[in-house]
């Protein structure tokens, strides 16, 4: 329900997955989507407080292997089923926490750190499902999964460029003036994305 409500294209893409793993991908998507919604859209509430509660509930769900929150309960089930490394979850939550206060990414190191936590690790969580415990296959495909995560995230940055800047006062691309986005800057961003896709495929 969450996947279909928030991303029609992703919901359609998951129809190509085997039914045996489709629910687990939905479970991961539901978790990351809820975290993202808290930091990006709950403007009439104390987002910091909501995020802290969400993080605490997530940690308890993983430890106790159950949650009364259906999204977190579904996620912890997939987390344990595929032995998803906890450091992936930690990195994701760190990037989401950055969205609560950080508005500009001045250096490429900051930019890469955010993308790793907000996108690369999500690809790696999904990869855990796809390889179903095959550690050798996971290591073989790890770099490609991360590159695809980076590419799709940068495409999303471009798609949401105007909304992020005007509604959230947030910019992700370092050394880029959104008020004067010249052809050279656009070309650099597009070339970054092409390079990521080349590694991913």
Model-inferred region functions:
Residues 1-201:
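Acidic catalytic motifs of isoprenoid enzymes
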């Amino acid at each position: 329900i969450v996947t279909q409500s928030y991303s029609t294209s992703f919901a359609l893409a998951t129809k190509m997955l085997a039914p045996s793993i489709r629910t687990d991908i939905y479970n991961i998507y539901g978790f990351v989507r809820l975290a993202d919604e808290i930091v990006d859209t709950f403007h009439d509430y104390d987002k910091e407080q909501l995020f802290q509660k969400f993080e605490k509930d997530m940690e308890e769900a993983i430890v106790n292997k159950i949650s009364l929150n259906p999204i977190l309960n579904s996620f912890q089930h997939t987390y344990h089923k595929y032995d998803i490394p906890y450091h992936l979850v930690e990195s994701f939550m760190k990037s989401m926490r950055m969205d609560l206060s950080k508005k500009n990414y001045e250096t490429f190191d900051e930019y890469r750190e955010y993308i790793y936590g907000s996108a690369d690790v999500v690809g790696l969580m999904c990869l855990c499902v796809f390889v179903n415990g095959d550690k050798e296959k996971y290591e073989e495909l790890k770099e490609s999964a991360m590159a695809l995560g980076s590419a799709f995230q940068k495409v999303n940055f471009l798609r949401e460029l105007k909304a992020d800047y005007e509604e959230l006062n947030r910019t992700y691309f370092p050394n880029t003036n959104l008020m004067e986005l010249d052809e050279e800057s656009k070309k650099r961003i597009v070339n970054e994305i092409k390079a990521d896709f080349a590694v991913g495929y």
